[in-house]
Amino acid sequence: MNPNQKIITIGSICMAIGIISLILQIGNIISIWVSHSIQTGSQNHTGICNQRIITYENSTWVNQTYVNISNTNVVAGKDTTSMTLAGNSSLCPIRGWAIYSKDNSIRIGSKGDVFVIREPFISCSHLECRTFFLTQGALLNDKHSNGTVKDRSPYRALMSCPIGEAPCPYNSRFESVAWSASACHDGMGWLTIGISGPDDGAVAVLKYNGIITETIKSWRKQILRTQESECVCVNGSCFTIMTDGPSDGPASYRIFKIEKGKITKSIELDAPNSHYEECSCYPDTGTVMCVCRDNWHGSNRPWVSFNQNLDYQIGYICSGVFGDNPRPKDGKGSCDPVNVDGADGIKGFSYRYGNGVWIGRTKSNSSRKGFEMIWDPNGWTDTDSNFLVKQDVVAMTDWSGYSGSFVQHPELTGLDCMRPCFWVELIRGRPREKTTIWTSGSSISFCGVNSDTVNWSWPDGAELPFTIDK
């Protein structure tokens, strides 16, 4: 074979290889296109069945090592359309309280990145329930946790995370700079209220879906403060109560009506012999009921009920089963303030059922320990101390703290009534546990059910002190 023939032969072979390679590439492209078409058709079929594939990601940080666990669940389609929460249902009939959530945040925080918090509370939309809390701008077991017993500082912020999860930087959403706060959902968006600033000039910042819509300046210049639990939304309007003035004497109390973050009406309560702080509010048949803290002179709890026009009634829970802390032994109640051990107090709640009342309270009369729910069938109007049901949820030997109400609307539960629920803060650290340099808390929550429940204790359970405390 002469040189020219060799060149022609080699060229022919190379061309043949090139053609074969081109054919293979075309085949590969066709294969990918067919595969994509099959997948697209499968997804369209899923859509026809009204199902969604939702990926939930739980992220855990241990010793700065990031572990991502992804679980894919096929979930029957849930309507995420915005809707106005009516709030006109009555409370569901209940026989007791079922455990709903427990975040164990102090236990987890001994080794993980968990916020130092206080004043946690829960609020639900028509799609989800979230835990809201006031951070101290610090993590547990870190040097910045020192001195976090202080209530008001520029480092505090309202944040939220999915209910039942320990609040950490990786699952939490910033809501507002605040050392006093409230939040609620009207079916279309979250309203948040965050109060921050100096004691003699604090400002409440209202946000709707994360955008500032309104501000309220302290009108008495004596520590403007709000509920530390959820506000209430009825037919597109949301309602909250704020206090400004002394914590040990008559103060000023205002109810605000808010629509999409804008104040549409407000009134001041005419209640010279009452004291309203840190109110726990809920909707019931289109009206709003708030049960509050009397830090001035009552060991029973004051209440205020109002309609959407802000026409209101006020009073005190009459039962001889007293709900505040400190408080005297149960005995003769009053529909006015019970002055015995009436000074100071703690945030709490009750649910009214006609003349009856479910009273949530610490088990201890004098310290923030234990927690129990008591059903007094005539306690809203009668002054005796007889009750029918007592359910223990935190033992007398374990720390508790603030407590408050929240509800689950029929739009969330599918029930034809408003499900009553409550949360309990489990405070750890200072000022009671002096082996620590910090103050923080975890939380538990319960919801009312018309079925069997149990007496038990669900304490915080963290072993103190932490490494930073030694």
From Swiss-Prot:
Membrane-crossing residue ranges in chain numbering: 7-27
Glycosylation sites: N44, N58, N63, N68, N88, N146, N235, N365, N455
GO molecular function: exo-alpha-sialidase activity; metal ion binding
Active-site residues (renumbered): D151 (proton donor/acceptor), Y402 (nucleophile)
Description of how the protein assembles with itself and partners: Homotetramer.
Family membership noted in the UniProt record: Belongs to the glycosyl hydrolase 34 family.
Protein name as annotated: Neuraminidase
Species the sequence originates in: Influenza A virus (strain A/Leningrad/1/1954 H1N1)
Chain's gene name: NA
